[in-house]
């Protein structure tokens, strides 16, 4: 099953991740761990890092346990489930990383990207869509003076599409992880998954059976050697 493969792969990855600075458990006694799962309602002052420190957990363990779109996408009044402690808390592997993007159009689409809090042109291009900053900025300046300036929330950006190109889409039962994990598994981008699932942020459900089904684009490819960029 896809989910099992993803979860086991992440477990192996977490085993080699660096521990959170305040909780070095290099010589770990499983019997000393707090294995109680609880919930926590975030405040406007919280980040994934403050929550992790508060409960002595790995930020990535919390993000994946709550099936978040992005570990850093956290705001007031999120009801987060706090996972049991583990010997190797993960503080690194779930975060979006800057890509050395060369693409100037998006294979297969979609055409629109809806902004969320914290989005900038640079973050959308290099961290979420794996496209050059210039290709996104040219068509989505929206009055911002810098690629680092935060964009208004819930604004649709027109993203250049490669023509001709195609994506296939598949339903995916999102029972564990973050969008970065799914993007790596299906060889797609976080931004494309976000664009297909605009109403989803994270899951409060403790049950895998009640976890969300999301739409994942996969197999995105150009259909010709020479493509045009269309808005």
Swiss-Prot record:
Briefly state the protein's biological role: Secreted LysM effector that might have a role in sequestration of chitin oligosaccharides (breakdown products of fungal cell walls that are released during invasion and act as triggers of host immunity) to dampen host defense.
Cite the Pfam families for this sequence.
LysM
Q: Does the keyword Glycoprotein apply?
A: yes
Q: Which GO terms describe its molecular function?
A: chitin binding
Name of the featured protein = Secreted LysM effector LysM13
Highest taxon of source: Eukaryota
Annotated Gene Ontology cellular component terms: extracellular region
Q: Which residues does the UniProt record annotate as the domain LysM?
A: 38-82
Q: Which InterPro entries match?
A: LysM_dom (IPR018392), LysM_dom_sf (IPR036779)
Q: Where in the cell is it found?
A: Secreted
Signal peptide range: 1-19
| Subcellular location, principal | secreted
Quote the record's miscellaneous comment.
In plants, chitin acts as a microbe-associated molecular pattern (MAMP) that is recognized by lysin motif (LysM)-containing plant cell surface-localized pattern recognition receptors (PRRs) that activate a plethora of downstream immune responses.
The positions flagged as glycosylation sites are 30, 34, 77, 100, 130, 201, 226
Q: Does the keyword Signal apply?
A: yes
Q: Which family does it belong to?
A: Belongs to the secreted LysM effector family.
Present the record's domain note.
The LysM (lysin motif) domains are small globular domains involved in binding chitin in eukaryotes. LysM13 contains one LysM domain.
What effect does gene inactivation have here? Show no significant difference in the expansion rate of lesion diameters in apples fruits.
